[in-house]
From Swiss-Prot:
The chain crosses the membrane at residues 21-41. This is Peptidoglycan D,D-transpeptidase MrdA. It is a single-pass membrane protein. Catalyzes cross-linking of the peptidoglycan cell wall. Involved in the determination of the rod shape of the cell. The gene is mrdA. The active site is at 326 (acyl-ester intermediate). Residues 616-672 are annotated as: Disordered. Signal peptide: none annotated. It catalyses: Preferential cleavage: (Ac)2-L-Lys-D-Ala-|-D-Ala. Also transpeptidation of peptidyl-alanyl moieties that are N-acyl substituents of D-alanine. It comes from Acinetobacter baumannii (strain ATCC 19606 / DSM 30007 / JCM 6841 / CCUG 19606 / CIP 70.34 / NBRC 109757 / NCIMB 12457 / NCTC 12156 / 81). Keywords: Carboxypeptidase, Cell inner membrane, Cell membrane, Cell shape, Cell wall biogenesis/degradation, Hydrolase, Membrane, Metal-binding, Peptidoglycan synthesis, Protease, Transmembrane, Transmembrane helix, Zinc. Monomer.
Amino acid sequence: MKQHFPLKDIQQEKRIYRGRIFFAVGLVIICLLVLASRYAYLQIFHYDEFSTASDKNRIRLQPLPPARGYIYDRNGVLLADNYPVFTATLSKADVENVDTVIEQLQPILELTQEDVDRFKSRIKTARKTERVAIKLNLTETNIAKFSEVKYKFPGVRIETQMTRYYPHGDLFAHVIGYVGRINDKELKSIDKDLYAGTNLIGKIGVEKSYEDLLHGTPGYESVEADAHSNILRHLGRKDPTRGNDLYLSLDYGLQVVASQQLAGRRGAIVAIDPRTGEILALVSSPSFNPNLFVTGINHKDYSSLRDNIDQPLYNRAVQGVYPPGSTIKPMEAMGGLHYGIVDWATAISDPGYFHLPGDSHKFRDWKKTGHGIVNMHKAIIMSCDTYFYILANQMGIDQMNQWMRQFGFGQKTGVDLPSESEGLYPNPEWKMRTRKSKWMKGETISVSIGQGAFTATPLQLAMATAITANHGSHVVPHVLRATHGAKPFTVRNAPDGKINFNGTDEDWVKMREAMIDVIQSGTGRGIRTPLYQIAGKTGTAQVKSIAQGKRYNEAALSERQLDHGLFVGFAPADKPEIAIAVIWENGRHGGSAAQLAKPVFDYWLLTRKKNPIRPANHQVNGGLMTAGIKPGELPSGNESASSTPATSAPTSAAASTPQATPTRPATNEVDE
């Protein structure tokens, strides 16, 4: 049977085909229009915006941390140096999961939990492309282990950064201080742009006081990097500005000598140029090695320092407060002249004690049998307590307080070191405010000989002595002598005023002569010398109170219950170049403290001019980088002196800070 097939409708098929073509062409045109509009959006209307965003993905600004300024002594001896260390770093832009990377790096870089916590704290506030230190001061073993698995951590780099090094170890620790890693509290207060790429900041001492000068200004380098943070091109840079170099008023040789005197002892020595207020030496013993703190002290070392009964971290010279004992008698005597209560001829008969009218309690002199007929000159020479009991009773605590504050007691000196203590010059208002009780007249008597609640720092005693040497002119103590660098800074060396004194200049001369006689024939006669004249005053401060009627029995006391020995003085007496304050904790009496001051005077006035102590050559006017020396290759601070007198600072002396109980003074048979 024959099949029949319908004929094709050619026209209809053409229409269908043509429609499909038009649809396809239209679809292509629409797609092209979408692409063209998107292209116009990106490349024409928002070109600048997206071009910048694109560049940010491949062009980065890397901070260039500034080199920290060096610190020198007055003669150019290098006290604080910079040294390169290897540091592991990363940025948030380089890794997908920061926590995972850090966890994987812990066994490789031997990260402690403290390292991890510090890194996480810093990375939180860092910019996305800012590189943050994971660990400072990597060892060769750390670097070798990381090199083997480096391919697993494309965003982690080993970089060279500068860190701090103190070539003289514990010798200047309490003055210079140290730098340490920036902590959470500091992160909130610093200018993050100014500290970009920086891990260290001044913590105590000069490093903290002059952080703004020492730190410098960071620079930046523009680089092109790929997705793995590998640098492809260096596009340009702005160099950092290094911090200012600081030249301190301290003298290396004098610091060595002063430190030697306190080796194995607890105490402090402060030496000042009374003409300018420049601090020539400042020693607190025992001391510590500041290098332990720079890249992070471990728990064991810190616990050893913190829990040490001798408190090596405690700056006795600036923070330590002690009863000043008889060292303040020259200043107090000048107050008697100021108020017209006594003159140089005023004399008393000293039976060895004093009692207030209507009170049977005896305030005893240190010399049980008394000093006989005593005028002001003899009272200073023999350190007659009874004379000052009578003077204080006539002067009264209010006038005493007003007068003694002019010498700086009970207030900060304004020294350019942090954490200075005010000490305390007690008065009725203070007692009512703090103890809710009235002032007793017997307390005035105790204060008159530097006991009771009266406390002062060694720095305050040195300043009061400098004011006495200056005939009342006041200078501000300071350790900064000069700076060199991009940041201007003016150091003041001129006297900033004079105390209000109603007497004459001749009165100051007579006081100087009395203090000279203290050394020639009085309680300080153990340090007299024909080579120059010293004007001084000894002092003894009770640590353990003694009941009325009881004798001071040294044999019955422990070593830490023995009296403190103090000494203040200046020399040459007629044209003072140096004023000194010494506190020897539990040193028994002021004569012992004077023995510690004598070598300091000798070095400054004699030895320094002929045979000054200098450290090894590579520690003068340069850095470890210049000398090509690693910290481990340096001798310790104790081995660096090249002259024979006084070889070192103390490394582990003994000391706590016992305070004298504020009670009525009792008999003390020890010669002050």
